[in-house]
Amino acid sequence: MNAQCLKKPEEGESSPGTGDKILQRNSLRAISPESSAKLYCCCGVIMVLTVAVVALSVALPATKTEQILINKTYAACPKNWIGVGNKCFYFSEYTSNWTFAQTFCMAQEAQLARFDNEKELNFLKRHMNSSHWIGLHRDSSEHPWRWTDNTEYNNTFLIQGDGECGFLSDNGISSSRDYIPRKWICSRSSNYMLQC
């Protein structure tokens, strides 16, 4: 820069570009040591914020992907099944005999419904709209009741009737012959893995 440009014009003297020179002088004043410190401080804050935004933009999608993968591995009930406790239940809309109902449930990797406590029994009663086959059966009225997995029923709840197959109705647990058409309830453990 030549000395002519930095020369302060005399009072009353005007020359072409005088406004530019005044602007230059004011600009030089703006870059004082005090202004430099403020400038560095602002630049530092901007850089910290930029790094934070970049870090968050990288971290958030990774977290979202991780959550999606975790959600895919949680235990869930299959579509059209209802979960309670650690079990899933399926309530049929059609009627059939006890043997067909059990075959249907087995095809779904389940059994005719088994309940292990009063809470599960009450849940089943609330969700059915007519009598439904459940997983209780026996060879004759002389034999004990068994679940479809062949474990013996503990007789916690009274079973009415002299039939060989158990069903659930508004009146509780009853029994009848296996050929009578009824709706049915399947049950399975809720460790079913959701397949996407």
From Swiss-Prot:
* CDD domains membership: CLECT_NK_receptors_like
* Keyword Transmembrane attached: yes
* Positions glycosylated per UniProt: 97
The cellular location(s) given in this protein's UniProt record come to: Cell membrane
Q: Please list the disulfide bridges.
A: 77-88, 105-186
Q: Which domain of life is it from?
A: Eukaryota
- Give the start-end ranges of region Disordered: 1-21
User: MF terms per GO, please?
Assistant: carbohydrate binding
Q: What broad class describes the main subcellular location of this protein?
A: membrane
Function, please? Lectin-type cell surface receptor.
What's the protein here called? Answer: C-type lectin domain family 2 member F
Gene this protein is translated from: Clec2f
